[in-house]
């Protein structure tokens, strides 16, 4: 049986979401999408240009993918809501990744403005995936507000520092009855695999792929790592032990 999961009524087979913000050329995007196997691709609304197709990043996203605009640039809930509405009016569908950031140094999300935006947009029929700093109470409020999934950061955006929030993300996986999608900071395929081994529903990767020496090869590497991590989670890793345990008997071979 195929391992799938659902968001907003859509059944997904790929657990790797792909961001598009940092590719050196838009022409790399369709190649990276195909190599990664991603079905959900995020784009910033400010990079969607309906007048000039060459500059319109959405034109490079394969038509069979779910286009998920993000509200990058929003500083409060009102701005995030406005961006989401503009994206839907521009024909980008009703999926939206909420990003509300007022911190210009660390680019950490404003969880409370994110909750407000989620509640408004979910009530308007959007499939809302909020980007948030991992916090159990905030995640519960996002679920109550109508979020379709929760997207806790692994590390600050674009840092490639890995899963620095591991224990906090684990709590969300255990306690929140929504897909948990680790977003931001994952810099290596092994880190994506680690998130999946913990039980995350999916991961979103942008910088680590887009800024790699060979973005298409790195996209494939992340796709394989996500599959490996998910398979390991389903297989059920063995327990860790404090002391060594021999895998073969230590007695009864050369002596009684």
From Swiss-Prot:
InterPro entries on file: Aldolase_TIM, Thiazole_synthase_ThiG, ThiG
GO biological process: thiamine diphosphate biosynthetic process
Binding site for 1-deoxy-D-xylulose 5-phosphate: 158, 184-185, 206-207
Active-site residues, Swiss-Prot/TrEMBL: 97
Listed Pfam families: ThiG (PF05690)
Gene Ontology CC terms, in alphabetical order: cytoplasm
Keywords: Cytoplasm, Schiff base, Thiamine biosynthesis, Transferase
Catalytic function, reaction form: [ThiS sulfur-carrier protein]-C-terminal-Gly-aminoethanethioate + 2-iminoacetate + 1-deoxy-D-xylulose 5-phosphate = [ThiS sulfur-carrier protein]-C-terminal Gly-Gly + 2-[(2R,5Z)-2-carboxy-4-methylthiazol-5(2H)-ylidene]ethyl phosphate + 2 H2O + H(+)
Disulfide bonds: none
Location in the cell: Cytoplasm
The keyword Glycosyltransferase belongs to this UniProt entry's keyword annotation: no
GO molecular function, one term: thiazole synthase activity
Pathway: Cofactor biosynthesis; thiamine diphosphate biosynthesis
Enzyme category, top tier: transferase
EC numbers for this chain: 2.8.1.10
Keyword Transmembrane among UniProt keywords: no
SUPFAM superfamilies in UniProt: ThiG-like (SSF110399)
PANTHER family: THIAZOLE SYNTHASE (PTHR34266:SF2)
Subunit architecture: Homotetramer. Forms heterodimers with either ThiH or ThiS.
Role according to the record: Catalyzes the rearrangement of 1-deoxy-D-xylulose 5-phosphate (DXP) to produce the thiazole phosphate moiety of thiamine. Sulfur is provided by the thiocarboxylate moiety of the carrier protein ThiS. In vitro, sulfur can be provided by H(2)S.
Family of the protein in this entry: Belongs to the ThiG family.
Listed HAMAP family: ThiG
UniProt-recorded name of the protein: Thiazole synthase
Organism: Pelotomaculum thermopropionicum (strain DSM 13744 / JCM 10971 / SI)
Gene: thiG
């Amino acid at each position: 049986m195929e391992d799938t999961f659902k968001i907003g009524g859509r059944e997904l087979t790929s657990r790797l979401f792909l961001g598009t913000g940092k590719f050196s050329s838009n022409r790399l995007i369709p190649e990276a999408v195909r190599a990664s196997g991603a079905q959900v691709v995020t784009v910033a609304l400010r990079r969607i240009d309906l007048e000039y197709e060459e500059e319109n990043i959405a034109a490079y996203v394969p038509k069979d993918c779910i286009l998920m605009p993000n509200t990058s640039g929003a500083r409060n809930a009102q701005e995030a809501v406005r961006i989401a509405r503009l994206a839907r009016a521009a024909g980008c569908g009703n999926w939206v990744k909420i990003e509300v950031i007022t911190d210009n140094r660390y680019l950490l999300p404003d969880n409370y403005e994110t909750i407000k935006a989620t509640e408004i947009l979910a009530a308007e029929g959007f499939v809302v995936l909020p980007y948030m700093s991992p916090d159990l109470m905030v995640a519960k409020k996002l679920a109550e507000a109508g979020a379709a999934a929760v997207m806790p950061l692994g590390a600050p955006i674009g840092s490639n520092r890995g899963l620095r929030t591991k224990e906090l993300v684990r709590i969300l996986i255990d306690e929140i009855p929504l897909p948990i999608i680790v977003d931001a900071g994952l810099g290596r395929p092994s880190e994506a695999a680690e998130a999946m081994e913990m039980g995350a529903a999916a991961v979103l990767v942008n910088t680590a792929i887009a800024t790699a020496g060979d973005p298409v090869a790195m996209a494939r590497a992340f796709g394989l790592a996500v599959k490996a991590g998910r398979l390991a989670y389903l297989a059920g890793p063995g327990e860790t032990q404090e002391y060594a345990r021999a895998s073969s008997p230590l007695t009864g071979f050369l002596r009684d």
